Amino acid sequence: LLGTGESGKSTFIKQMRIIHGAGYSEEDKRGFTKLVYQNIFTAMQAMIRAMETLKILYKYEQNKANALLIREVDVEKVTTFEHRYVHAIKTLWDDPGIQECYDRRREYQLSDSAKYYLADVDRIATSGYLPTQQDVLRVRVPTTGIIEYPFDLENIIFRMVDVGGQRSERRKWIHCFENVTSIMFLVALSEYDHVLVE
């Protein structure tokens, strides 16, 4: 599977795993919890930065403080979803300024799953939260390196190779082409008018 970063290569593999493989056990899903939280913080931080760049104002004054609180979070260290952050993110998401910023998302880099997660923060913030299959499918984690996934379809073994799509990862692609019978190049239809992050 080839394509630029965020073109859907890993999502395609996840779909294949759900449809034709073993799917995701409860333990597998639990492993995505932290990543869902991180995706929420990453999305909100991207919008907070874009608010400044696009010169959009918050309608509600308290959201300046909420933005500062969320902006200072080190996303890599996020493992839980504390109430003060949940409240800040919900309040920010409800601000007309952030909604205008979201509507202009093609002008900056924002994950496709941002609205999906931000509109469902209450469910995700509950104690004992276990990601659904849809939550798992929408998690954005940049692929680094080369990962092979075998699938058995009607007694035929398919080996799909997922490679990182970021520019720095593309030089590794050539090593994948020995004994290859098919190549799928994926393109995200939702990004035809977006600015490429690189």
UniProtKB/Swiss-Prot annotation:
Keyword annotations of the record: Cell membrane, Cytoplasm, GTP-binding, Hydrolase, Lipoprotein, Magnesium, Membrane, Metal-binding, Nucleotide-binding, Palmitate, Transducer
G3 motif as annotated region, ranges: 158-167
InterPro entries in alphabetical order: Gprotein_alpha_su, GproteinA_insert, P-loop_NTPase
Localisation: Cell membrane; Cytoplasm
Domain G-alpha, residue spans: 1-198
GO cellular component, one term: heterotrimeric G-protein complex
Binding site for Mg(2+): S10, T143
Region (G2 motif): 135-143
Quaternary assembly: G proteins are composed of 3 units; alpha, beta and gamma. The alpha chain contains the guanine nucleotide binding site. Interacts with RGS22. Interacts with NTSR1.
CDD domains linked: G-alpha (cd00066)
Membrane topology: Lipid-anchor
Source organism superkingdom: Eukaryota
Residue sites binding GTP per the record: G3, T4, G5, E6, S7, G8, K9, S10, L137, R138, V139, R140
Catalytic activity reported: GTP + H2O = GDP + phosphate + H(+)
PROSITE patterns, per database record: G_ALPHA
Cysteine pairings via disulfide bonds: none
Gene: GNA11
Descriptive protein name: Guanine nucleotide-binding protein subunit alpha-11
Region feature (G1 motif): 1-11
GO BP field: action potential; adenylate cyclase-modulating G protein-coupled receptor signaling pathway; phospholipase C-activating dopamine receptor signaling pathway
MF terms (GO), sorted A to Z: G protein-coupled receptor binding; G-protein beta/gamma-subunit complex binding; GTP binding; GTPase activity; metal ion binding
Described function: Guanine nucleotide-binding proteins (G proteins) function as transducers downstream of G protein-coupled receptors (GPCRs) in numerous signaling cascades. The alpha chain contains the guanine nucleotide binding site and alternates between an active, GTP-bound state and an inactive, GDP-bound state. Signaling by an activated GPCR promotes GDP release and GTP binding. The alpha subunit has a low GTPase activity that converts bound GTP to GDP, thereby terminating the signal. Both GDP release and GTP hydrolysis are modulated by numerous regulatory proteins.
PANTHER family: GTP-BINDING PROTEIN ALPHA SUBUNIT, GUANINE NUCLEOTIDE-BINDING PROTEIN SUBUNIT ALPHA-11
Homology family: Belongs to the G-alpha family. G(q) subfamily.
